[in-house]
Amino acid sequence: GRVKIGSRVKIGYFSQQHEGLHPENTLVGELNYDFGIAEEEARKYLGAFLFYGDEVFRRIGDLSGGEQARLAFLKLMLTGANFLVLDEPTNHLDIPAREAVEEALMAFPGTFVVVSHDRYFLDKVANTTAELANGTLREYEGNYSYYRMKKEIEEKEAAEAAAEKA
């Protein structure tokens, strides 16, 4: 098939490897470098992603994986993208950081597609679940738990139908 992306769709991508970060920059410096944001405004944004006080002057290369993930997510939000593709966004995150990401996504006015092994996270943020299997994409109108429930019903019905044919 073909996918046509609308002229007003701006795609943002969150990579679990955080390739878009510059290890030599400070957090404040990174926001200035990529977005031209001055220190005072950068501190406000960074605070919303749990970076406080002098932490904003740490080098990105010295951050933990979870801290880098939070910064990468902040940068993604600042791009103005209205369609997000998120590759394992909760990897390396502690509980407060994961909850901050959940809240940000639930408030996000656009569309997002998430690839994740974090079932709890998917239950919190997803309202549609897609399954790609055997070259077919199937859509389920619900979160991950709803998807699992529907799959169990389908599997049970398929097993019963097979037993009746035997």
At which residue positions do the language-model features occur?
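ABC ATP-binding cassette signature C-motif
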Residues: 1-166
